[in-house]
A protein has these predicted regions:
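OB-fold/S1-family single-stranded nucleic acid-binding modules
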Residues: 130-151
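Intrinsic disorder/low-complexity segments enriched in polar/small residues
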Residues: 9-12, 100, 106, 121, ...
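Signature of Gram-negative chaperone-usher
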Residues: 69-108
């Protein structure tokens, strides 16, 4: 298996509906250790390229007949900076009205329930070799998430606009 030597900048990814998110590190049935991580869907050409250079990509069958298969990458979110080798990730949340907030270890959990409009991220590889097995795991370097406009806010604005038109 080739070892990955460069950071890969991924754009135009989907971490919305149907993807796994655990930025808060909550212990679950399928995540007994409470590992902070999330998954992203990748375009086929990006997924196959990353797989070719050593990344582990999950191939998901089509959800419905006629759909394309999906390619999923799990990304770790680590705040463990004991060795000083890697700084903690930079995570920003942009709201639909343009406000931007930086999220930290104790606030990143809000992304677990955020309705995501768009996301851009940078990941770094971590090449591992344990008990004769080797691979490459993706870790988050930087993430900017744009939240979808909440329906309540949209409905309130529409009502306000209608009231202004009536005046």
């Amino acid at each position: 298996m080739p070892f990955v030597k460069e950071n890969e900048r991924l754009e135009h990814i989907s971490i919305g509906r149907g993807t796994y998110r655990n930025f808060g590190g909550v212990k679950t049935t399928y995540n007994k250790s409470g590992e902070r991580k999330f998954s992203v869907f990748l375009p086929e050409e990006v997924a196959l390229y990353l797989e070719d250079i050593g990344w582990y990509i999950k191939h998901k069958p089509p959800y419905r007949e006629g759909d394309d298969p999906q390619y999923q990458l799990d990304v770790g979110v680590s705040y463990d900076t004991k060795d000083g080798k890697f700084p903690p990730p930079i995570i920003r949340l942009k709201t639909w009205d343009g406000e931007e907030t930086e999220l930290y270890e104790d606030t990143a959990c809000v992304l677990d329930s955020t309705d995501i409009e768009d996301a851009e991220m940078e990941i770094r590889p971590y090449n591992w070799n344990v008990d004769g097995k080797a691979g490459c795991k993706a870790y988050l370097v930087e993430l900017t998430v744009t939240a979808r406009k909440p329906r309540r806010a949209l409905n309130a604005r529409l009502r306000r606009d209608e009231e202004e038109e009536e005046d």
